[in-house]
A protein has these predicted regions:
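Membrane-embedded alpha-helical bundles of multi-pass transporters
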Residues: 116-130, 159, 178, 417, ...
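Transmembrane helix-loop-helix hairpins at the membrane interface
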Residues: 92-246, 357, 458, 723-728, ...
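Conserved catalytic phosphorylation-site environment of P-type ATPases
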Residues: 295, 354, 389, 402-476, ...
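Juxtamembrane coupling segments of multi-pass membrane pumps/enzymes
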Residues: 187, 196-198, 212-273, 304, ...
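Conserved cytosolic catalytic loops of P-type ATPases
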Residues: 32-55, 205-206, 237-331, 429-473, ...
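ATP-driven catalytic headpiece of P-type ATPases
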Residues: 95, 314, 438-442, 448-481, ...
Length: 853
């Protein structure tokens, strides 16, 4: 967060299409002092960076014809801002649509059914043409009042010299309505003069149904578009729910429960087993294992002892902790993640709909053509009625029904297809843009892997069976709450072992392991360092543990009365479909990057098994968001994850894809949710997105071809040559046909097979990541160096322990693996340690170093 300009967030009202958001962004960007402005049509929000005063920014928005309000400062409760983000549009549009249909159906019956197919009508209207016209006028007027928002928005935008899709809808409907009103007066005049031929002629020139149909069909399109908008703005609210509301602090030597806002830096607070850490702090008394999955996304609890740091919203799984608050309020790690999500949501680039972009040119062009058509026909001597009819025909046939429905109808069908296969696209934008992905960043835990540790290997020493090893391990681990212990318990259940050994004097030592007594024998379980204190570990078993660790597995050692009995390896194994999913993504020309907070060795092992292109290990929550920023400079990025630590990265990415088994916040922050938690659904989602986008392009192509052919015909271009002229009624019919064709084409998506990889094609603009990624990986590789020392004089395990302890006490030495049998010490270092220092350290213990490699 440091080094960035302060961002102010605003709620914008009155936007209806991409042209609106573009106008707001342009207006605010021109304000002096604004360095960056980004408007999101999906969230109706605007993020502004710079020094400009908020009142000036709001005035700029209002001058552009829209409304703006500064969002409240983030507090414990953001109910006011959250209320602004609720989806109120869909219910309103649905109500408008249903009400409109109630009046449109009888209007269509009277205008089309009776006139064209002689359907029966009430006797009072039979032959009473003026009354028929007035009834149609009434129905059309009601529908126009119901959908008055189109007229308010459309004409308001026109007056601000920024016509949008609502403008075209309003003009087309108003022109049809106005012409029909004129026809009523003309018919009434003809009726008064007993000119029945004129009355019958006028009777067929009512276009009230066109005015009403235009509004109703566009309302359908608007509702479909509103339904496609997701709930990405719920992410902040979900994040805040993770923060504890209270804390237990020590004041006047008594434990008192207070509101979280009353905790100050330096306060002493206590956390009992099963409770969440209220604020960031440092442990001053006690030890425990903390489940940090809420922040790190890793499922394995981290052992904590005195002096270690703790973070808000992490879960204390075992011991009693007394901590000193170091960061409270907006300074906690959780609050920083919340702020990152907020900023990312506000600065996410707005994606204008294709139809809205085109309508910026299309609308004024059609208006000009309609006006020019009327003028030309008047100049060549035609009557005003003839010229007006040609102008109205242009407006009616150019109605953006097909243009407006091209995207939302395809989106609706695509969303339905995705839902059937457990792939939920939360917004229209997500369905359109997912297929354009060039880079996929995958979180490891729960995405590539199952997220649940499992026993993968059992390596008993000679003379011990796997069942005996598992029985002793079970006796120890069944009293532990550690997730790795759960893996062993699950393995015992699967193996159906019923040897119930009883453990006495059970002791859990934080950061090390477990101990207890079975009959008169003392048994131990834990990591290598812990077991080495109580039993000798053969070099062959050390090498085996190294081999297991290099495969991304965690080796657990078990000993009985100073004798090692074996190793049980536990790992978060990769999902069965992960390698195939990664391969399919690569076959599409997409670069696959794995991000994880794990150590480099584990990360590389998992990455190799999955077959990803690049691995970045040791990435913290803030780091993941930063990596996504860097990757976005190379191309369009999709992030796939499931933990809260992924939320900033999911929101920052061009497309956030959440695994269904993840936390609610990750799902809320994402654009796409994979309900079945299968990585193979990622390439399936990309295929569906590409197919949908192709369908949208086909729909738009049809809409344009229709207008290119229809507009000249409506304008009467062929009248002088062939005598062809288009009645506005047929223009309306053509408009309806164009919409039908668009919907029918969209329905073809139901036949699409999204899991079929046989027709996958590589993207044309594949990106190159080697430079940025190789530099990152090289730096990580340089962090760990190894040297092998040849040592003389070591005779037993005590000698090994002495040399090991001496070497590991050196600054920069991460680990020393010593063997008196081999006469070697393999030293792993994070910093360079000279040969002279290593030699002197060993020889100070009365051993001789003969060689260092």
């Amino acid at each position: 967060m440091k080094g960035r300009e302060t961002m102010e967030q605003y709620q914008v009202t009155g936007m209806s299409c991409g042209a609106c958001s573009a106008r707001v962004e342009k207006a605010v960007s021109s304000v002096e002092g604004v360095t960056s402005c980004s408007v999101s049509l999906l969230t109706n929000s605007m993020g502004v960076e710079g020094t400009a005063d908020s009142s000036v920014i709001i005035k700029a928005v209002e001058d552009a014809g829209y409304g703006a309000k500064k969002k409240g400062v983030q507090t414990q409760s953001n109910s006011a801002d959250a209320d602004l983000l609720k989806d109120r549009e869909t219910p309103v549009l649905k109500k408008r649509l249903i009400t409109s249909l109630c009046f449109l159906i009888p209007l269509m019956y009277l205008s089309m059914g009776h006139m064209m197919w002689n359907w029966p009508i009430p006797k009072i209207l039979d032959g009473n043409h003026v009354a028929m016209g007035l009834i149609q006028l009434l129905f059309a007027t009601i529908i126009m009042v119901i959908n008055q928002k189109f007229f308010i928005s459309g004409f308001k935008s026109l007056f601000h010299k920024a016509p949008n899709m609502d403008t075209l809808v309003a003009l087309g409907s108003a022109a049809s309505y106005g012409y029909s009103v004129y026809i009523i007066f003309a018919m009434t005049d003809a009726q008064m003069h007993q000119n029945m031929d004129a009355v019958m002629k006028y009777m067929h020139e009512f276009y009230f149904e066109s005015a009403a149909m235009i509004l109703t069909l566009i309302t359908v399109g608007k509702m479909l578009e509103a339904r496609s908008k997701g709930k990405t703005t719920d992410a902040l609210k979900s994040l805040m729910k993770l923060a504890p509301k209270t804390a237990v602090v020590i004041r006047n030597e008594q434990e008192i429960e207070v509101g979280i806002e009353q905790v100050h830096q330096g306060d002493i607070f206590v956390v009992k087993p099963g409770e969440n850490i209220p604020v960031d702090g440092i442990i001053i008394e006690g030890n425990s294992a903390l489940n940090e999955s809420a922040l790190t996304g890793e499922s394995i609890p981290v052992d904590k002892k005195e002096g270690d740091t703790v973070s808000a919203a992490t879960l204390n799984t075992s011991g009693y902790l007394k901590c000193e608050a170091t960061r409270v309020g907006e300074d906690t790690t959780l609050s920083q993640i919340i702020q990152m999500v907020s900023d990312a949501a506000a600065t996410k680039a707005p994606i204008a709909k294709v139809a809205d972009k085109v309508s910026g040119i299309f609308v004024p062009t059609v208006i000009c053509i309609a006006i020019a058509t009327m003028i030309i026909w008047l100049l060549v001597g035609q009557s005003f009625g003839f010229a007006l009819a040609r102008g109205i025909s242009v407006l009616v046939i150019s109605c953006p029904c097909a243009l407006g429905l091209a995207t939302p109808v395809a989106i609706m069908v695509g969303n339905g297809m995705g839902a059937k296969h457990g792939i939920m696209f939360k917004t229209a934008v997500s369905l359109e843009e997912t297929g354009k992905t060039q880079i996929i960043a995958l979180d490891k835990t729960g995405t590539i892997t199952s997220g649940k540790p499992q026993v993968t290997d059992m390596v008993p020493v000679e003379g011990i069976s796997e069942e005996e090893l598992l029985s002793i391990a079970y006796a120890l681990e069944k009293k532990s709450e550690h997730p790795l212990a759960h893996a062993i318990l699950q393995k015992v259940e699967e193996a159906q072992i019923h040897d119930n050994l009883e453990i006495k004097n059970f002791l859990a030592i934080a950061g090390n392991g477990l101990s207890g007594k079975i009959d008169k024998e003392t048994v131990y379980g834990g990591n290598q360092r812990f077991i080495e204190k109580y039993a000798k570990i053969p070099l062959s078993m050390i090498k085996k543990s190294e081999e297991l660790a290099n495969q991304g597995k965690t080796p657990l050692f078990f000993a009985c009365d100073e004798q090692l009995i074996g190793i049980i390896a536990v790992a978060d194994v990769i999902k069965e479909d992960s390698p195939q999913a990664v391969k399919e993504l690569q076959n599409m020309g997409i670069r696959v990057v794995m991000l994880t907070g794990d150590n480099e060795r584990t990360a590389k092992a998992i990455g190799k098994q999955a077959g990803v292109d690049h691995v970045i290990a040791g990435v913290l929550p803030e780091g993941k968001e930063s990596v996504i920023r860097d990757l976005k400079e190379k191309g369009k990025v999709a992030m796939v994850g499931d933990g809260i630590n992924d939320a900033p990265a999911l929101t920052r990415a061009d497309m956030g894809i959440a695994i269904g088994a993840g936390t609610d916040i990750a799902i809320d922050a994402a654009d796409v949710v994979l309900m079945k938690s299968r990585l193979s659904d990622v390439p399936a989602a990309i295929r569906l997105s590409r197919a949908t986008l192709k369908n949208i392009h086909e729909n738009l192509f049809w809409a344009f071809i229709y207008n290119i052919i229809g507009i000249p015909l409506a304008a009467g271009a062929w009248y002088m040559l062939l005598g062809w002229k288009l009645n506005p009624m047929f223009g309306a019919a053509a408009m309806s046909l164009s919409s039908f064709c668009v919907v029918t084409n969209a329905l073809r998506l139901n036949l699409f097979k999204m899991h079929d990889a046989s027709k996958d094609q590589k993207i044309k603009n594949s990106v190159v990541l080697e430079e940025i990624q190789v530099q990152n990986i090289t730096k990580q590789e340089e962090k760990t160096m190894k040297k092998t020392m040849k040592i003389e004089g070591m005779m037993c395990g005590h000698c090994e322990a002495a040399v090991k302890k001496a070497l590991e006490s050196l600054d920069g030495v991460e680990e020393a693996i010593v063997s008196h049998e081999e006469g070697t010490a393999v030293v792993s270092m994070t910093n360079e340690v000279s040969d002279d220092v290593l030699t002197q350290t060993v020889e100070d213990k009365d051993y001789k170093v003969t060689e260092i490699e």
